[in-house]
Every structure is written in structure tokens, then in C-alpha cells.
Swiss-Prot record:
It is an enzyme of class 6 (ligase). Residues 1-61 form the TGS domain. Residues 242-533 are annotated as: Catalytic. This is Threonine--tRNA ligase. Keywords: Aminoacyl-tRNA synthetase, ATP-binding, Cytoplasm, Ligase, Metal-binding, Nucleotide-binding, Protein biosynthesis, RNA-binding, tRNA-binding, Zinc. InterPro entries: aa-tRNA-synt_IIb (IPR002314), aa-tRNA-synth_II (IPR006195), aa-tRNA-synth_II/BPL/LPL (IPR045864), Anticodon-bd (IPR004154), Anticodon-bd_dom_sf (IPR036621), Beta-grasp_dom_sf (IPR012675), TGS (IPR004095), TGS-like (IPR012676). Belongs to the class-II aminoacyl-tRNA synthetase family. It comes from Rickettsia bellii (strain OSU 85-389). Catalyzes the attachment of threonine to tRNA(Thr) in a two-step reaction: L-threonine is first activated by ATP to form Thr-AMP and then transferred to the acceptor end of tRNA(Thr). Also edits incorrectly charged L-seryl-tRNA(Thr). Coiled coil: none annotated.
Length: 633
């Protein structure tokens, strides 16, 4: 007999070699009917898994979050089965679950069309309704290779050759379809009910541009109909808010082939950019930061010393000149250490908070570029805090408070924190890591945040915090970071004189609130759906005249607003007032100042706010004062 421990703390005895499904039947028929997979000693397994030792067991259903990835993996197999039935000449390759869905790569001469996707999806529903049994089989390696070659599945045969010899070759069979897979999978295709095929894209075999291009079908799958509908609605909203589309419509920026991954900022977009930079500059000055500027092009010898050349060489732009190799900096940290090293530093100089809006370049693959979200040329609100070990907690608390304040000003209040602790391969002693991790945990808690743990995901040189924002349609964006570094000060020989007179290495805290300004602006465009708040809007007030005889007064109003630092647009053309208002509304200007005969006589304007029908009559002084207060962030 074996002892099975259940989540409620109970322990029951069963005969050896009983399956997880058979145990589910003993517990209740309803559980057995809903059961998808088993968690045995923390590992996810098929329900058909035989248990011959004492263990901890959870029977999981679609209600359990662990099953969502299984549902998506099952949907990938269902997609492949449908494709093979409809297009038998197609070769299947790989089909993993990914965030919010899955994909499956196919080798086929003729491209899949949108109509093909609809047919494939219909076939998937048909196969799911058949509720085909899914079974796991272990095969001899040579037999598996020969089998896949015999049915023309040469990619599968190649995959088997790359599987370590000590790993079993497991296949899953459903209906007439058989696929190479580690699993686990649900016991039948009927568990995959709520899915949709999304698009087709090209993908290199094994992600290598030297290999052939495959066709990748993307799909999404969820545990419930409501979850699927919610996700599709979110995608619909995201499409409406796409910063690339709005960037063009609102005349903010553009990209072109001659400078891939580099932004052409138009005047309105550059206004938003500069407003954000000036806002951050005011915040960090109030918080005791100095601002510096370091070279964009630096000799590779510094990058070799810092370790970046070894780790990031492929992502750096380099050029040869005067028998030297120079590289465009991908980050600012080594240059900041050079400034720290100028002159003798004392413990009295610490903490030293050094910031820079540093222009960085990263050689991102062209296929990874995505509007403002992924670029090759970027500016970060980057800063490095050089401090003593005993100052880590206070500096982290201070940073968390600043970050919270900044995010709130931009309208983000749902902030999640991820804490990444020591990886297996790391620099520094266990004692140093203990101190660092405890200091960060204490600081996060003092700042009023809870956190989720990412075990082993810290960098080799120190633990880190990641700050994740949730936007208006529920998407999450990782923006802020705080990274502790014991290694770079050592590598670049940075030191300070302690109170005892001995030389010590400072701890270096790499920190950013927005991250890349380009990416953060992309996030803001989508968060606001292009409707920037008044203080951030590229045009804060648009002036529109009802008749041409009011133009002189309109120009007076424009002059007064500009002299007060207000960003203004004006339309004094003969066009009808409704047309002018509609045009400014389409440009998402937050305030439209309408000028008629009465407004001119009273030295006033009638304000219409974007998205409302309400109107408010203000004097020019009142309007300027209101905007001044909004701009004071």
C-alpha cells in the first residue's frame, strides 16, 4: 500500500500502481469527470500516470490556473490535427503554449489564408466535440525517428535527434494524429472548448534566420467562454488604442525603412517627450539627484572591463576607427562609474544619486522591432545610486516612494512588484546576498508594497525589483526597476574612503522609473487612447473663432497663452465653427476655446472640454491660472 497526501491535509492508502484518474474516481465521480491533470509532488502529470510511491497529490480541473497552459498546449495539438486532416501535405514542427495563447509552426509551400484559418478553426471545433481520447506512448528512439520519416514528418525526426539520450521519447495520440511531446495533456480533446485562431506569421525554423521560413499559426485558448470573450474584447480595444495608429493620426511620430527602430519625432510627439523629460527632471532634483551627460560612443576596452562586451556584444553597434573599436553604449552604468571615480570620494559623499537621460543603442533584430515599444535608439530615465551597504534600505524606500508618486501623476495606481533573488551562478558571498535580499525586502515592505517572488531570477551581480503597471484595459507593463550591483564597482575599481579611513567598494543601485521614454510614451498613448491629460497634451488649448471679424481678439488670446507657457493651436479660417470644433476634437485637444462676439466684448473665452458637452466661460487670466496649476506636476 502507498500513502497519498491531499491538499486538505488528509492521507489515504491505495494499492500500488493506481493511476491519478482512478484516485479521482474514488474521491468523487464529479471530480473524475472534470479532472484534467494531476500534480504529483509539485510536478504536473497526465491523469494516466501510475503512482507506486508515497506522494502528495492534487487533482486539477479547468478552474485551477495551472490548467490554463495545458488547455493552450492541447489547443496547439488540436490545431495541428485539424491542419493535417485538411492539408495532409503539410509538415508539423513545434507548438508551445505562450502568454495568452499558443502557436504552431507548419512547413507548407502554399501560404495559409484568412479563409484557411476559418476552416481550420471549424475543424478544431468538430474534433473537440468528438472528444477524442488522448493517450501517451513511450517509443524507442530509432523507431520514433523511422516512423516520422516514413510519414514525411522530417522536422519531428530532426527534433528527436536533438533530445538528450537519457530522456524518454514520448508521443501523444489523439484520433488519427500523433505528435512528439513531453506533455502533460488532458485526457481527451473535449476539454478544449473556448479558443480562436488569431493570425498567421512567418517564423524561421529553430528561430535561426539561416533556416527555412515556416508558417506560424497563432491561437488563443481559455478555460471559459467569458475569459475568451474578455480577452478578445481587450484585443479589440488594444487595436483601437494601438500607439502606431494613433501616432500617425495625431501627427506624433513616424518610422521609416532608412532608419529602422529609430523614431522620427514630429513636433507634437516631441512636445510630449520633452514634457515628460522635464517632469522627471524636476522630480529627481527634488529628491537629491545630480544630472550628468556621458558619451554615446565609447572604446570597447571599457565594455570589456565592465563585462558588457562579453555578454552583450551581439546587441551592440560597433565601428572601427583609427585602429580602435568603438561601440555605441547600450546602457549608461559604466560611464557613470567613470564620473564617480573622478576625485576621491568619502563616506560623507554617499549616497551619490547620479541621473542621466542617456541616449542608448541596442541592435535589436528587425523582426523584434515594434513601434515605440521596441526600438534600437532609446533614452532611459536612468540613474545610479552609489551608497554604503547600510544605506541600501533607506535608498530603496526613497526610490519606491518617488516611483509611486510618478506613476500616480500619470494615472497608474495598480502597481505590482516582483522580487528576483539569487541565481545559481552568481558573484559575491552568501552573506552578501543575504544582506542584499533582506535589505530589499525590508525596503519594499516599508514602502507599503507586497511582492511576488521570482526565485533564482536575479542577475548574477545582485537581486532586483521589477515594478509592473496595469493599464486601462488590463494589460501589464514592466517599467520600473531597481537592481543591486556588487560587481561593477569591483570590476571598474570604484571606491570611497570609509569613516575608518579604509577603502571600500560602494554598492551600486541601478534604477529607472519609466524605463525607455520611447516605450513609456507608447504605453501612455495606448493608456489614454490618445487623449493626453491637460498637463501632458501637445496642444493644451485650441482657439476657434465663430466669424472672421473676431480674428484679432483670437490672436491676442493666443499671444497671452503662449507667453504664459501654454501650448496653443488656432484656427481663424472662414470654416464653420462646428467643423473647427470637430477637427480639434479629432486631434484630441483637451480644451477648445470658442470665441464669439460676446467673448470678445467681455475679454473671455467659452471652454469646451474634450468628451463632454458642458461649456464654461472663463477670463483669459482664469484660463491661464487653471492651466498653470495643471502644469505644476
Amino acid at each position: 500500500m502507498i500513502n497519498i497526501s491531499f491538499p486538505d491535509g488528509s492521507v489515504k492508502q491505495f494499492e500500488k500502481n493506481i493511476t491519478a484518474f482512478e484516485i479521482a474516481v474514488v474521491i468523487s465521480t464529479s471530480l473524475a469527470k472534470a479532472a484534467m491533470i494531476a500534480e504529483i509532488n509539485g510536478d504536473l502529470k497526465d491523469l494516466s500516470t501510475q503512482i507506486d510511491n508515497d506522494c502528495r497529490l492534487r487533482i486539477l480541473t479547468a478552474k485551477d490556473p495551472e490548467c490554463l497552459e495545458v488547455i493552450r498546449h492541447d489547443a496547439a495539438h488540436l490545431t495541428a490535427e485539424a491542419v493535417k486532416e485538411l492539408f495532409p501535405e503539410t509538415q508539423v514542427t513545434i507548438g508551445p503554449a505562450i502568454e495568452n495563447g499558443y502557436y504552431y509552426d507548419f512547413a507548407r509551400d502554399k501560404p495559409f489564408t484568412t479563409d484557411d484559418l476559418a476552416v481550420i478553426e471549424a475543424k478544431m471545433h468538430e474534433l473537440a466535440k468528438k472528444n477524442e481520447k488522448v493517450t501517451r506512448e513511450l517509443w524507442d528512439r530509432e523507431k520514433a525517428v523511422e516512423f516520422f520519416k516514413s510519414i514525411g514528418e522530417h522536422y519531428k525526426a530532426e527534433i528527436i535527434a536533438s533530445i538528450p539520450s537519457n530522456e524518454p521519447i514520448s508521443l501523444y495520440r489523439q484520433g488519427n494524429f500523433i505528435d512528439l511531446c513531453r506533455g502533460p495533456h488532458a485526457p481527451s480533446t473535449g476539454f478544449v472548448k473556448h479558443f480562436k485562431l488569431m493570425k498567421v506569421a512567418g517564423a524561421y525554423w529553430r528561430g535561426d534566420s539561416r533556416n527555412e521560413v515556416l508558417q506560424r499559426i497563432y491561437g488563443t485558448a481559455w478555460a471559459t467562454k467569458e475569459q475568451l470573450e474578455s480577452y478578445l474584447f481587450m484585443l479589440e480595444e488594444a487595436e483601437k488604442r494601438d500607439h502606431r495608429k494613433l501616432g500617425k493620426e495625431l501627427d506624433l511620430f513616424h518610422f521609416q525603412e532608412e532608419a529602422q527602430g529609430m523614431v522620427f519625432w514630429h513636433d507634437k510627439g516631441w512636445s510630449v517627450y520633452n514634457t515628460i523629460e522635464q517632469y522627471i527632471r524636476r522630480k529627481i532634483r527634488k529628491n537629491g539627484y545630480i544630472e550628468v551627460k556621458t558619451p554615446v560612443l565609447v572604446d570597447k576596452s571599457l565594455w570589456e572591463l565592465s563585462g558588457h562586451w562579453e555578454k552583450f556584444r551581439d546587441d551592440m553597434f560597433a565601428l572601427e576607427t583609427d585602429d580602435k573599436t568603438l561601440a555605441l553604449k547600450p546602457m549608461n552604468c559604466p560611464c557613470h562609474v567613470q564620473i564617480f571615480k573622478q576625485g576621491i570620494k568619502s563616506y560623507r559623499d554617499l549616497p551619490l544619486r547620479m541621473s542621466e537621460f542617456g541616449l542608448c543603442h541596442r541592435n535589436e533584430a528587425s523582426g523584434a522591432l515594434h513601434g515605440l515599444m521596441r526600438v534600437r535608439s532609446l533614452v532611459q530615465d536612468d540613474a545610479h545610486i552609489f551608497c554604503a551597504e547600510e544605506q541600501i534600505t533607506d535608498e530603496t524606500v526613497s526610490f519606491c516612494k518617488l516611483l509611486t508618486e510618478v506613476y500616480k501623476d500619470f494615472g497608474f495606481t495598480d502597481i505590482k512588484v516582483k522580487f528576483s533573488d539569487r541565481p545559481e551562478v552568481r558573484a559575491g558571498s552568501s552573506e552578501t546576498w543575504d544582506k542584499a535580499e533582506n535589505a530589499l525586502k525590508e525596503a519594499v515592505e516599508k514602502a507599503g508594497y507586497s511582492y511576488t517572488l521570482n526565485p533564482g531570477e536575479g542577475a548574477f551581480y545582485g537581486p532586483k525589483l521589477e515594478f509592473v503597471l496595469t493599464d486601462a484595459i488590463g494589460r501589464q507593463w514592466q517599467c520600473g526597476t531597481l537592481q543591486m550591483d556588487f560587481v561593477l564597482p569591483e570590476r571598474l575599481d570604484a571606491s570611497y574612503v570609509a569613516a575608518s579611513g579604509e577603502k571600500k567598494r560602494p554598492v551600486m543601485l541601478h534604477r529607472a522609473i519609466l524605463g525607455s521614454l520611447e516605450r513609456f510614451i507608447g504605453i501612455l498613448i495606448e493608456e489614454y487612447a490618445g487623449r493626453f491629460p491637460l498637463w501632458l497634451a501637445p496642444v493644451q488649448v485650441a482657439i476657434a473663432t465663430i466669424t472672421s471679424d473676431l480674428n484679432d481678439y483670437a490672436l491676442e488670446v493666443q499671444k497671452a497663452l503662449i507667453e504664459s507657457g501654454v501650448r496653443v493651436d488656432i484656427n481663424i479660417s472662414p470654416d464653420k465653427i462646428n467643423y473647427k470644433i470637430r477637427e480639434f476634437s479629432n486631434q484630441k485637444v483637451p480644451m477648445i476655446a470658442v470665441i464669439g462676439k460676446q467673448e470678445k466684448e467681455n475679454k473671455q473665452v467659452t471652454i469646451r472640454r474634450l468628451g463632454t458637452t458642458e461649456q464654461e466661460v472663463l477670463s483669459i487670466e482664469q484660463l491661464i491660472e487653471y492651466i498653470r496649476e495643471e502644469n505644476s506636476k
